[in-house]
Every structure is written in structure tokens, then in C-alpha cells.
């Protein structure tokens, strides 16, 4: 009889970062500025790469694709956050919730693989510079980008598809600022063990595989740089990798802290902050990390501005 009286939940409520009424307007302004800078930075970088023929090379095609993934990651989360800051209705349908997670998850996974192929590009450029034009053609670069996005979309599609096997009747409140799939498992009436197991297996494989590939690539790169006799050559080689290495460190460093905080039972607010950095701050920083000290990007910007 109790089973019959259960009401199935079809809409969820996102609690957001805080329920304090006095903070809603200031937070809206802060995250609106962050979101606008993120879009201008990433979409501007994409437009610059598309517009300037000097940047039609593999590394910048990868960089443009990374900028697109960052813009999509930020948009999938921040746009709904901004609406919720000003709206009293924080309701979200199951379909919209699944869609939000799908686009966030697919672009986050894509970014893992884009960082790997960018490291491979740097490996070929530094370890085999004479073969670089042959090995890293624009067509191969396009294939790498396509494969990265395909894996990202497929990975998210699997988890979103399995999400619809669950029913929700305990609560419709998600104590988070976006539809994070693990938060949905907490309020599921159906046993989510299969879903959790598959997320752990897929995520562990993707993150360990991509991280170890990055470690191996940079081990070879570092070895090749240290073998260079010219200090100027070593300095130039380090500078070509520094931006990517910083981006990788931020990306996987945040993932590591998110994992440690979840395993140690840290406060929910602390977990939110790590997730906030991963979903909103990294997409904000990336275009500036790759652009501010990049002579080719700055020169391209000057050429466009002169026109």
C-alpha cells in the first residue's frame, strides 16, 4: 500500500550556492561578469583563430576546439545559475535536468581528450620537429578533434540513458547549483548501484588513461628539452609547453581535490567550491592562459585590429 501512495517526482529544485536572499543579487552580478568574460575570451579566441590564416595550424585548431568546449561547459551550468539567482522558481524538469548534465558531461569529457591530443602535438613538435609537418597534418588534427567530441558525447549519452531507469519519489530537492548526476542518485527511489558503478568505471578509465598519457608525453618532452644544448632552445621549448602544462595542472588538480574531498567526507560546501572552480573558473582562465604570453596569438590580434 505504501508503494502505491508514493508520488513520482518529475521536477527538481536546485538549491544553488546559497539560499540567503541578500546574496542573490550580488552573486548574480559576479557570475554574470564571469560568464560574459568567459564567453568573450573563448569565442573571441575561436574567432581569431578562424579569421587569421597564420593560426590555421594543428595546435591552434586544437586550441579553438578547447575554447569551444570551455564555452559550452560554462554555458551549460552558468546560464541556469544566473536565472535562479533572480527567479523564485528554481524548478527544473527531468528532461531539462538530464539535458544540462548531458552537455556539461560531454564537454568535460571532450576536454580531457583534447588536452591529451594537444600534449601529443607538443610531443611531436619538440621531440620530432622535422617530422612535425608530416605527422601533424590539419586533416589528422580534425580527426583527433572529431574523435574527442564523439567520445565525450557517447560517454554522457550512456549515463543519461541509464538515468531514465531510475524513479524519484523521496525528494525533489537537489542540494547543488546544477544537475550533477551523483546528486540525483542520492534522491532516487530505485537502487542506483548499477549507475554508480558504471560512472566509476568509465570516469576512472577516462581520467586515469588521459592523465597517464599526459604524464608519459611530458616525460618525453622534458627529456628532449633537457637534451638541448642551447639555453635559448630550451627556453623556447619550455615556453611552448608552459600554458598547456598550467591548464592541465588546473584541470586535473581540481579533479584530484574533488575526489579527495568526496572520499574524506568533507563538507558539502567545500565540495561545491571545488566543483564551482572546475565548471566555471577553469573555462574563464583557459583562453587567457593560452593567449596572454602567446606571441602568435597577440600578433594575430594586432593584425586584425589594424584592419
Curated annotation (Swiss-Prot):
Coiled coil: none annotated. It comes from Homo sapiens (Human). Odorant receptor. This is Olfactory receptor 5AC1. CDD domains: 7tmA_OR5H-like. It is found in: Cell membrane. Disulfide bonds join 97-179. It comes from the Eukaryota. Residues 1-28, 78-99, 165-195, 261-271 are extracellular. SUPFAM superfamilies: Family A G protein-coupled receptor-like. Keywords: Cell membrane, Disulfide bond, G-protein coupled receptor, Membrane, Olfaction, Receptor, Sensory transduction, Transducer, Transmembrane, Transmembrane helix. The keyword Membrane applies. GO terms for molecular function: G protein-coupled receptor activity; odorant binding; olfactory receptor activity. Residues 50-56, 121-143, 217-239, 293-307 are cytoplasmic.
